[in-house]
Swiss-Prot record:
Similarity comment: family membership: Belongs to the eIF-5A family.
Protein's name in the database: Translation initiation factor 5A
PANTHER family named among the record's database cross-references: TRANSLATION INITIATION FACTOR 5A FAMILY MEMBER (PTHR11673)
Gene3D superfamilies: 2.30.30.30, Nucleic acid-binding proteins (2.40.50.140)
Native organism: Methanosarcina barkeri (strain Fusaro / DSM 804)
Gene: eif5a
Amino acid sequence: MKQQVEVKELKEGKYVIIDDEACVIKSITKSKPGKHGAAKARVEAIGLFDGQKRSYIGSVANKIYVPIVERKTAQVISITGDITQLMDMGDFSTFEIVVPDEYKDKIKEGEEVSYITALGKIKLDIRT
């Protein structure tokens, strides 16, 4: 799910969709309006799910999509290799995700973990 906002309403640390990917805004720079033009904004962001750096350049009055990012908790049901089966603690639905190598030793069966969901993608949100 996503919604539209004007570029001038964006803030650092919030989310934005650039190249059909949910991103976290790292910096926003705005230029002054010229004699015949509108102010421009440059948004630097990092992909929430892939970690790639992306940028957007456009008028401050332009509208841009912002993803609706949800943080939820789930219980680890089973771990098979690098695939983990989780059950959402809110609606009790089950789903499987691939766990990155750096998180494999931090999750155990029966524990609760938090995860992020946006634009139909899911990512573990394990904070150390």
